[in-house]
Amino acid sequence: MTGRVCRGCGGTDIELDAARGDAVCTACGSVLEDNIIVSEVQFVESSGGGSSAVGQFVSLDGAGKTPTLGGGFHVNLGKESRAQTLQNGRRHIHHLGNQLQLNQHCLDTAFNFFKMAVSRHLTRGRKMAHVIAACLYLVCRTEGTPHMLLDLSDLLQVNVYVLGKTFLLLARELCINAPAIDPCLYIPRFAHLLEFGEKNHEVSMTALRLLQRMKRDWMHTGRRPSGLCGAALLVAARMHDFRRTVKEVISVVKVCESTLRKRLTEFEDTPTSQLTIDEFMKIDLEEECDPPSYTAGQRKLRMKQLEQVLSKKLEEVEGEISSYQDAIEIELENSRPKAKGGLASLAKDGSTEDTASSLCGEEDTEDEELEAAASHLNKDLYRELLGGAPGSSEAAGSPEWGGRPPALGSLLDPLPTAASLGISDSIRECISSQSSDPKDASGDGELDLSGIDDLEIDRYILNESEARVKAELWMRENAEYLREQREKEARIAKEKELGIYKEHKPKKSCKRREPIQASTAREAIEKMLEQKKISSKINYSVLRGLSSAGGGSPHREDAQPEHSASARKLSRRRTPASRSGADPVTSVGKRLRPLVSTQPAKKVATGEALLPSSPTLGAEPARPQAVLVESGPVSYHADEEADEEEPDEEDGEPCVSALQMMGSNDYGCDGDEDDGY
């Protein structure tokens, strides 16, 4: 009995069966509940006597174990792919956020951005690390934290432009307007890295004031904030007597040297740069400057206009110069004397040529100047030819000449030479002066200080203050190298104390080998083997003897055994006894040769038995053939040497007798190759 009421009949007599897990009304028989799930915590006792709770707690975003139904049933109720992606993204966001020291609010916001990117399928085709870094930087921009995209690039070891491309894509697709970064956020961070000590706050405040002035002068828009921070910190450090070099600043703000110098140049063009330190700290100029890009554009426009004006003025000046040049040429033509006779015709021809060339426009200004100079030189020549002597202009119109042209001999005088002009004497003097002073040309190692003032030499010698400044500059430039050397010396000293230092052996100086002088290749190889032996297991004296006797000698040939020579001769002379294998009738029909064939004499070695030869039909009496028996070394003559070539002649089909053609060869022979039996 329970306090439940039946929904069918309203009775309260309800029977509960825990084994079946159902509730049935005993009045009407309706089933009120089926498969009742018990929600209380149950404990089970294990075989070892311990008790354990039944079931497990699964968090909302935690990775739970795969549930099992009994020992033999495993049900895979894992998460879907999107849930796994979100879980991995949250883990990576927390990992990177802890390295950047972001608070929990920023991490949750970044995870929300990541979920939006996953829902819009922006993670497809992109690495998850890039998307997570872009989400974190998006949070840094919206929340105003002093973090740069370069910091995330250093953590992930990824190109900063790749992360920037992903960040711009997320901001555009998610419709998030990322505000511009205020460079004032990075001033405390960079000032702490530059180590200003007790004046860190003062330098930071001065740098912030400089940045505000730069923002009012439109230097902030379109510029990287790190470059402005570097320029402001460099100026603020100099204002507070801190000597920070450009290299130290760019190593902290992570911009290139040209960017930092460009920001300083832009600040130098503003009126604020003309103020003193006290005036800058007390006075704020109300006027604002134009943006640097606009100023640069105006400057380029003015330069272009000036170039156009100058080009017009240059054209006007060139026109005036050409007019003056024409007037000068006209005056020179008028002042030129008129020639008579043959010279007049020559001058006329020259004038016509000049007129034609001027009409064609082939001569330039340089040719005109040369013509003017030639006209002045020809003027004296004409006077000399016409007057008989230089300077006698009146003789040109004297009746002695009578209008006759000068003789050809006077016109064909020899041209001036180097001797007549005195050039050879000057050349000889120059050569003699060079030969008399060989020390000046070659130099003997002594410095000639004659003609040099002492004050000029003193300017090359540094005084104490200049030497001290130069020494400080050298120490500052080579500080890193000196520090490494000190660390190296300390490490070596420590290793020597511990007894683990190994002395580096000095390198042996390699001597250049003298070239091998040899007349033949064999001699060169022998000398090379003497200098550098290939192997210690080779007796080079025996090898040298073998190489000297490698050509072969007569006594070695004579020492060969007798039977080898005779066997060689017999092997060359031996031919097949018969070449049967074809039909006898066809053999007779093919060969129209005499039935009797003469066999050449054969040499029989010692110990060989001569086989009896059967007589052939119609054999003609042949000359007796001598049997040569070799009993020792035999020297063969030319006829025997010719016999050695018989195998080449016997390649063809040999002559056979009638008995051989009929197949009645009664003396022993080997079986034919083509025997068909």
From Swiss-Prot:
Identify the domain of life: Eukaryota
Instruction: Choose any GO biological process term that the UniProt entry carries and state it.
Output: rRNA transcription
Give me the sequence repeat coordinates as residue ranges: 91-172, 185-269
The cross-references to SUPFAM superfamilies, in alphabetical order and at most eight, read: Cyclin-like (SSF47954), Zinc beta-ribbon (SSF57783)
Where found, per UniProt? Answer: Nucleus
- Provide the residue span(s) of the region labelled Disordered: 340-368, 385-413, 501-521, 544-653
TFIIB-type Zn finger ranges: 2-33
Recite the UniProt keywords alphabetically.
Activator, Disease variant, Dwarfism, Intellectual disability, Metal-binding, Nucleus, Phosphoprotein, Repeat, Transcription, Transcription regulation, Zinc, Zinc-finger
The record's listing under Gene3D superfamilies reads: 2.20.25.10, Cyclin-like (1.10.472.10), Single helix bin (1.20.5.650)
User: By its UniProt entry, which PROSITE patterns does this protein fall under?
Assistant: ZF_TFIIB (PS51134)
As for what it does, the entry says: General activator of RNA polymerase which utilizes different TFIIIB complexes at structurally distinct promoters. The isoform 1 is involved in the transcription of tRNA, adenovirus VA1, 7SL and 5S RNA. Isoform 2 is required for transcription of the U6 promoter.
The associated disease is: Cerebellofaciodental syndrome: An autosomal recessive disorder characterized by cerebellar hypoplasia, delayed development and intellectual disability, as well as facial dysmorphic features, short stature, microcephaly, and dental anomalies.
Family label: Belongs to the TFIIB family.
Can you say what this protein is called? Transcription factor IIIB 90 kDa subunit
